[in-house]
Amino acid sequence: MIRRLLIAWMLPATVTAQAPVVDYHQHLFSPAASALVTGKPESPGINAKTLVALLDSAGIQRALVLSVAYTWGKASRAPVDNEYEHVKAENDWTAQQVAQYPDRLRAFCSFNPLKPYALDELARCSRDSALRYGLKLHFGNSDVDLDNPENVAQVRRVFEAANGYRMAIVVHLRTSIDNKRKYGADQARVFLDQILPGAPDVPVQIAHLAGSGGFDATIDAALGVFTDAIARQDPRMKNVWFDACVIVRPGMAAEQLQTVATRIRQIGVARVLYGSDAAVSPASYPKAGWAQFRRLPLSEAEFRQVAGNVAPYVR
């Protein structure tokens, strides 16, 4: 433990000052989850040792690891036998992995919030010393329809329960592309008006700047709902953070990059977090992700602010 702490404290002195302190959007995959997602039974997955090595190569001290247990309940996939047992196993495996590097990694549990077991699993995670810090919800993977009042009410219940457990929430807000769910300003307002107020006392991190990676007019319309709320000092936004995970894509036009930079300034760089997503290929490794993010027309002071931001749930 002492050796790991010393390494973590020494890292900033041995790498560029521009390296982020924390990667706020990472995933580990158990061999079982990797086989499920890739369709390859021999898939080894991504473990904590691999991730920490990638963080070291990027000069990044820590990472927020978002469990992918929700993928066992993916709405567009055929049902899995003993689904809830797989969800628990994936959350537990993630907890075991991060426990190997307690000074470097922090885990959030996950599940499909529309499933009958959702509140039971949240309660179970709240009692786990490695998972009690927070919850990851993926509206796209779970096919949360923000135009469906029953879906909205159920997700609100999950938010209220997480607030009661004092668990932070990371939410992939973009609805299902596979199922062609509507998404834009109207759906973002539903989240702001009907779901977010269920968790007034805990931090909420909106992933991918309210998108799913990249940046287009649809994402911009949704994000605009939140930047407008920030501009009018809406109290519902006081604990909201945004990760800019895989926003900048190769070949992105200068005009798009400028739009993203403008939105980041409207959000406020003090609440924008760096994230690189699952390290499934060299192009998505933390170091490569930061290099892509650096293409944005932000000032060096703004990059330093984003790199140094430390959200409450990783302190």
State where each predicted segment sits:
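Active-site gating/metal-coordination segments in enzymes
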Residues: 77-183, 246
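Acidic-and-aromatic substrate-binding clefts and catalytic sites of carbohydrate-active enzymes
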Residues: 40-46, 71-73, 83-87, 112-119, ...
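Divalent metal-dependent hydrolysis catalytic cores, especially in the metallo-beta-lactamase
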Residues: 38-39, 44, 49-77, 104-112, ...
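Mid-to-C-terminal alpha-helical segments outside catalytic/metal-binding sites
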Residues: 17-24, 28, 32-62, 266-273, ...
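Active-site neighborhood of phospho(di)ester-bond hydrolases with catalytic His/Asp-centered motifs
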Residues: 21-24, 65-66, 108-109, 136, ...
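Short, acidic/polar
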Residues: 45-54, 116-126, 259
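Sec-dependent N-terminal signal peptides
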Residues: 4-13
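Catalytic pocket-lining loop regions of alpha/beta-barrel enzymes
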Residues: 132-134, 147-273
